[in-house]
UniProtKB/Swiss-Prot annotation:
The gene is OR1D5. Odorant receptor. This is Olfactory receptor 1D5. One of its GO terms (molecular function) is G protein-coupled receptor activity. Keywords: Cell membrane, Disulfide bond, G-protein coupled receptor, Glycoprotein, Membrane, Olfaction, Receptor, Sensory transduction, Transducer, Transmembrane, Transmembrane helix.
Length: 312
């Protein structure tokens, strides 16, 4: 196959992480189950928030958008993955691969930025409660979300355009679940120094800056909570941000396992970590946010038409 990766006929072979038919069947049913659970969980969160005026607050506004992002995120990768598990033809066109990569980068970035905005929301609610209504006005919430979307779209476009300049040659076999940046760069036969430098530099800004902001927010939140004299009030206050803290830990923990390493050390063992951030995290987010949320339990009960009992 020649090195002209701009050809409309260019293709990759998306081989997945196993070529065993038996293992592929197991993986098919596993990922199908996880996909259905993810879709159901995030759709229920969106329906619950949109159907009850008591949940029309900044925190739930951002949570609904996080659920929408997670829903879009898994739909970008898993359906193609399921088709490949059941098909002998593993080919994915170059254009389709780049499209998948674009949405993957954009949606991961959007997830990251929304989590940072949610941390700011919790900071204002706990550290500056008297100013919460004015500080988190509907106009500001829409503006913050628009900035998140804009930065995510531009960042995904930047990396995708840079990837479009990379030349591939030899066997274009992707032993992975989807078209992922590091995996594609390992297949390149042209110099990838520039794109790798841009990837590291922009990645540090796009991901570490929000992480630093969230860390600073939680330092102030913890300090404020420690000043509360009542133990029960401390617990109640902390519980309002515990779910967000759990999601942030899961999101950044799995991303760090995959991306905080040199390109030349990237290997198939990182597939497990990739599955964690690409599939497990979007699946777990609705459960984490609704597990101990009494308001969410009541609304979900009405949406489902039956009582929604919190697990003992």
């Amino acid at each position: 196959m020649d090195g002209d990766n701009q050809s409309e006929n260019s293709q990759f072979l998306l081989l997945g992480i196993s070529e065993s038919p038996e293992q592929q069947q197991i993986l098919f049913w596993m990922f199908l189950s996880m996909y259905l659970v993810t879709v159901l969980g995030n759709v229920l969160i969106i329906l619950a928030i949109s159907s009850d005026s008591r949940l029309h607050t900044p925190m739930y506004f951002f949570l609904a958008n996080l659920s929408f992002t997670d829903l879009f995120f898994v739909t970008n990768t898993i359906p193609k993955m399921l088709v490949n598990f059941q098909s002998q033809n593993k080919a994915i066109s170059y254009a389709e691969c780049l499209t998948q990569l674009y949405f993957l980068v954009s949606l991961v970035t959007l997830d990251n930025l929304i989590l940072a905005v949610m941390a700011y929301d919790r900071y204002v609610a706990i550290c500056c409660p008297l100013h919460y209504v004015t500080a988190m006005s509907p106009g500001l919430c829409v503006l913050l979300l628009s900035l998140c979307w804009g930065l995510s779209v531009l960042y995904g476009l930047l990396l995708t355009l840079l990837m479009n300049r990379v030349t591939f040659c030899g066997p274009r076999e992707i032993h992975y679940l989807f078209c992922e940046m590091y995996v594609l760069l390992r297949l390149a036969c042209s110099n990838t120094h520039i794109i790798h430098t841009v990837l590291v530099a922009t990645g540090c800004f796009i991901f570490l800056t929000p992480l630093g902001f969230m860390t600073t927010s939680y330092v102030h939140i913890v300090r404020t909570i420690l000043q509360i004299p009542s133990a029960s009030k401390k617990y109640k206050t902390f519980s309002t941000c515990a779910s967000h803290l759990g999601v942030v830990s899961l999101f950044y923990g799995t991303l760090a396992m995959v991306y905080l390493q040199p390109l030349h050390t990237y290997s198939m063992k990182d597939s497990v970590a990739t599955v964690m951030y690409a599939v497990v995290t979007p699946m777990m987010n609705p459960f984490i946010y609704s597990l101990r949320n009494k308001d969410m339990h009541g609304v979900l009960g009405r949406v489902l038409g039956r009582p929604f009992q919190r697990p003992k």
